[in-house]
Amino acid sequence: LEDLQRGAFVDAYDIPPQAGSTGYDGAKAWEKEPSGTVTDQAGGDVIPLAITEAYQDRNLWWQPDHGGAEIVSAGQKTDGGNTYDVLTVTPKDGKPLEAWFDSKSHLLYRTVEMNSVQKLITTYSDYAAVDGAQIAKKLVIDDGSGNLQTLTLTSAKFSEALPLTAYRKPAEDLHDF
């Protein structure tokens, strides 16, 4: 769930027997753990990371002012025989990341960012048009542990903006497994 105007979001997962979510309402970040415990997330680089995620969700690098981010060319890089235009993007009050764009299609191919002390490499593929926007249907996340996390988008739609209350920290719902 993403608010493309205000940058708020909720990322939820439901992989039985566990479910949880994280969110950012534009000012505060929170996490709902599988136990149902809900906590504010404000330590370390949590808020700058949330700001950077909101920046990416809204594709602000395509705006005339780049959404207020500092953008520096890191040249071209190749991977699998393809060439990518690489930018170092630092959103205002966010964390820097490398964004790799396919030099032919200009679609986002990869992001490289530091999440606290962990380097995350996310690869985007299988783009499809949704209401005129190209959306990656497959994301592969490499956190360096040797295990890859693959996310597959099964449906997407654009709708009217929800009130910011939709992105606020939810109530606790404590339970045992």
Model-derived segments and their meaning:
Residues 60-74, 118-121:
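A short, amphipathic edge element
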Residues 1-37, 67-73, 78, 91:
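N-terminal mature ectodomain segment of secretory-pathway/periplasmic proteins
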Residues 58, 74, 132-135:
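A general structural signal for short secondary-structure boundary/capping elements
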